Amino acid sequence: MSVTGNFFSKLRSLAVTLEKETGQLEQLFSSEDNEYEEESPMRVLHDLRSDIMVLKGDFQSTLNKRLARGQELSAFIKACRVLHERTAADIEQIKETFQTYGYKPQCNANSEREQTQESGKPKENGVSPNKADVEDLQALPTLEKTASTSWDILRAPQLSDFGLAHYQLPTAWEPPKVKPCKKDPEEEKPRIMLKDPEPMNVAKTPKCALRLEEDFSQIQHFGISDCSTNLNDDYTMALINKKFQKNQNVTENAAKETCQPKNLKSLLATPSHLSHRMDWVDSPLPPVFCTPGLKVHKKEKMSLPGKPAEKKGLNANNTTLPSDTCDRNDPDSAHLEDDYECTAVKPAIDFKSTSAAPAYLSLGSNINSVYSPRPPVFCTPGLKVHKKETSSVLADPTEPKGTGCTDTPPLPSFQTNWLKSDAKEKGLDITEPVPRPDLSYRQCLEEPPTLVLNSNKYEAPAMRDYCMGTPPRPEMTVSLTEDLFKYNVKPSSPPKVSEYENMLWTPVRPEMTSCITEDISQILSKYCDNNMNPADGIWDKAGAPFGKISTEYENKENRLY
């Protein structure tokens, strides 16, 4: 029983071990299958093979580059060898050429010793030198040794070497002989100094270096010593003297400028005016309007019965008035002699005379006067105007303002003697110039307007600066009977006219050439004082105020008649 029991027990244990091993193998096989489920081994093998091929290609390209570079290097080495051989051949030819001129190539002492040693030990090596080499070494020219004592071997060839010493050619091309200089010992070379030398004391501008934590400036040494104080003193004194001279010159120039009188005209004048002596900046002269070929009666002076008339003797053809024509005894006009010209009636100037005479002669001798310009004169050719007679009603021009200039002269009486006297004295002469307006009133000259415009001057009372008289009745050239003028018509006193209404001067009535009957003239003369008909406004405008003047008289040629 023991034998069978042992056999079966062993068989049983063997079966158990087999089962365990089979189980393990199955487990391993199943685990391997699970691992390769995601990626197959053929795929892995393909990836590995592709990586290997890439690496192989990179290696092959790198190897090709190396080979190409090696070939280039070998070609360069071959070219260098060829060049070396050619250079050696050229050097040999040059040596041979130079040897003909006594050139001896330099050989190092060591190489000569080696050659002698090799020649002295031929038996040891067992090789005997060739006889040809020995002959070449012994056949070196000995002439060079003897000639080396007399002249330098390395010198440039000269003419004497070729037997041409008798030709004296310039030798500027020969290099200068440099004398051998002794080498400086190594001890005399500049040494590196570890410490910089101390700088010299030089005077410099003092600088104040302030810091927040310090209350005083940093003290520095500026190189000022007892020897240099005199130089600094001289320099500072020179600066002080220079500044003092500059200030003195400035004060002298300022004193000269203050001492010079200031002239307004010289300041306003331009350099061109000053260079041509035309430093006048006065207002321009007023224009004169006149008609050539027109003869106008001369206006006479009007005064009161108690006052004597002004001196006569004025010439109508003169363009300027002499200062003697003024009444020097008259106290009212005495103060106007120096400042303004005589205030008498002055005739107008025709265009011919104005072109010949200067402009400043027609309006006075004083060029510096800045009074207001005179009013223009408007005339009509072919008309004859009466001369202004003296009237007892008109105020004296020399009287004060408000007394003489406010009265308007009445209408003159129609008398035959007046017509006869005018007809005898003057005929129809169209060459006589037109007279200027009467500017003899005192108020026209006492307060002349300034050149600068002022708003106060344009008020109502300030504009009454001009005082113009009323012209007389014009001369009638038609045949009028003497019976019509025998009636003594006494004119009534006209209303007073303010100074503002007398600003503008009414021109003298021109001569009427139309035929008017005597009856109409008589009727007009009778009713001139009682009735203010339109005809009366035409004949006499003295009593009418300035603002109510009829528009019928606006035309200077009187086209109504």
From Swiss-Prot:
This is SKA complex subunit 3. It comes from the Eukaryota. GO terms for cellular component: cytoplasm; kinetochore; meiotic spindle; mitotic spindle; outer kinetochore; spindle microtubule. Residues 111-124 have a biased composition (Basic and acidic residues). GO terms for molecular function: microtubule binding. Residues 105-131, 304-327, 391-413 are annotated as: Disordered. Component of the SKA complex, a microtubule plus end-binding complex of the outer kinetochore that stabilizes spindle microtubule-kinetochore attachments, promotes alignment of chromosomes at the mitotic spindle equator (chromosome congression) and assists suppression of the spindle assembly checkpoint. Kinetochores, consisting of a centromere-associated inner segment and a microtubule-contacting outer segment, play a crucial role in chromosome segregation by mediating the physical connection between centromeric DNA and spindle microtubules. Belongs to the SKA3 family. It comes from Xenopus tropicalis. GO terms for biological process: attachment of mitotic spindle microtubules to kinetochore; cell division; mitotic metaphase chromosome alignment; mitotic sister chromatid segregation; regulation of microtubule polymerization or depolymerization. InterPro entries: SKA3. The gene is ska3. Component of the SKA complex, composed of ska1, ska2 and ska3. Keywords: Cell cycle, Cell division, Centromere, Chromosome, Cytoplasm, Cytoskeleton, Kinetochore, Microtubule, Mitosis.
